[in-house]
Amino acid sequence: MSVLLVCSCNMDITPKNIVSDDDMMGSPKGMSIYMATLYSHMPFEDFKYMAAWGFNFNGWLGTLGIDGSGEAMNRDDVFRTFRGEDNPCWSNAFELIHDANHLIESLPSYRSNFTESEYDFFMGQGYFVRAYVFYQMARRFGGVPLVTHTIAYPNSSDKLEIPRASEEDTWDWICKDFDTAISFLPATSLMSGLPNKYAALAFKAEAMLYAGSVAKYNETVTGRLTGFGDKTGVRVIGFSPDTYRDAYIRYFSEAYK
């Protein structure tokens, strides 16, 4: 004869392996962790980047001594076209953009937990990250889907399938995000290693010089690159013959503002 004993258990407890917005955005300490997460996945072309293999965030390139600096430039067919199979820069970029969008949308609800300077600093980081990631994508793909808000899953296809914007609209948005970041960021960074106002200005200048060069010189050479979205008909690669002159003048002007 067996006896089954059943004890009453309270299973309605908060999982300890899930970090909530209250944990991350409720204090400067939590936001420092959020910043570490963002910047550890930023597509900076430094020691974790090679043209042939893209971005590697696991330290693998560094351990091999072929991290894209100096002698590495002559190794392993480094100049071949990077196709992205090993390191999907497209999907990785949108994961980072999602995190930046979440910061921009959610941090205002926790504003009372920060001083004015702290709040502005972290908001500026969100806009800077989004601007920089879009910039790196535009360099590689031209016009990209401008996902500027968090997308709830699951959802209908019209909410999830955001088409690529034109290349000109993409660069315009990058400029706008950099300007917003610059307006928030202080002259002196509140955290070591994170950009201040002048670092954001420098990256904006770099992005706008790149955009202006593409707008001007791609449109004036034989065999220029251009392309249109299959569904939208939007010029996702290159600039319109009617607008490229105004575009490159605008971008070059933005570079030194």
Model regions and ranges:
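A solvent-exposed, charged loop/short amphipathic helix patch at secondary-structure junctions
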Residues: 220-247
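Polar, glycine-rich mid-to-C-terminal structural blocks
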Residues: 250-257
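Short, conserved phosphate-binding/catalytic loop or strand-edge motifs used
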Residues: 149-155
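Bacterial Sec-dependent N-terminal signal peptides
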Residues: 5-29, 174, 205, 220
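Acidic/histidine-rich, surface-exposed loop or edge segments in extracytoplasmic proteins
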Residues: 16-19, 75-86, 237, 241
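Short coil/turn linking the two alpha-helices of tandem helical-hairpin repeats
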Residues: 138-139, 145, 189, 210-219
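TPR/Sel1-like alpha-solenoid repeat signature
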Residues: 127, 201-207
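Conserved, well-structured interaction surfaces
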Residues: 27-28, 32-48, 67-141, 157-194
